């Protein structure tokens, strides 16, 4: 009896993970804007997304609508995500923000990459974020966290340098 319950629990968790991954399958950078769209699911959905992207390096940008430096650097991420769309994946994480503020922000700054809602900074803490805004994390193609940059990028060239160093050649 206990074995059946354990197996059923494992199958339930597997089914949830598969459903999350299937729901995220259309959220990549190849193509459309994700204006005004925030993905839920918390840390599990974020980790499922990273697992789905294995084989390509990933840049994760943690931001909030109330963060001035986030607003200043966000256009860099918009442009560089388009520039690197064949070799690097980008993911946004909106942490400790109101849903209305985040949606308004995304209306002004549409992105070609998915954005996760992270009201308690649970996702951000998984990549050493959640303490400073903005924070950018770089994952290698095999899914390992390579580097976390806390604070804003002063120039697009600075962000490009870190993309090359920690994502492309990481």
Kindly give the residue locations of the regions a language model identified.
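Thiol/disulfide oxidoreductase modules built on the thioredoxin-like
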Residues: 107-112, 119-167
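A short beta-strand-turn-helix
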Residues: 36-58
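Bacterial N-terminal signal peptides that target proteins for export
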Residues: 2-15
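Hydrophobic beta-strand anchors of alpha/beta hydrolase catalytic cores
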Residues: 59-60, 90, 136
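Bacterial signal peptide processing site
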Residues: 28-30
């Amino acid at each position: 009896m206990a074995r059946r319950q354990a197996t059923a629990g494992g199958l339930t968790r597997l089914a949830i993970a598969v459903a999350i991954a299937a729901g995220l399958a259309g959220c990549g950078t190849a193509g459309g804007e994700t204006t005004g769209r925030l993905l839920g699911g918390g840390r599990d959905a974020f980790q499922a997304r990273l697992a789905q992207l294995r084989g390509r390096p990933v840049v994760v940008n943690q931001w909030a609508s109330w963060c001035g430096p986030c607003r200043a650097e966000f256009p860099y991420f918009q442009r560089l995500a388009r520039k690197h769309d064949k070799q690097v994946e980008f993911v946004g994480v909106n942490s400790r923000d109101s849903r209305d503020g985040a949606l308004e922000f995304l209306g002004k700054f549409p992105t070609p990459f998915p954005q996760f809602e992270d009201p308690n900074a649970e996702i951000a803490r998984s990549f050493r974020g959640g303490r400073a805004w903005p924070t950018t994390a770089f994952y290698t193609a095999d899914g390992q966290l390579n580097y976390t940059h806390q604070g804003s990028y002063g120039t697009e060239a600075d962000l490009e340098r870190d993309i090359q160093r920690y994502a492309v050649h990481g």
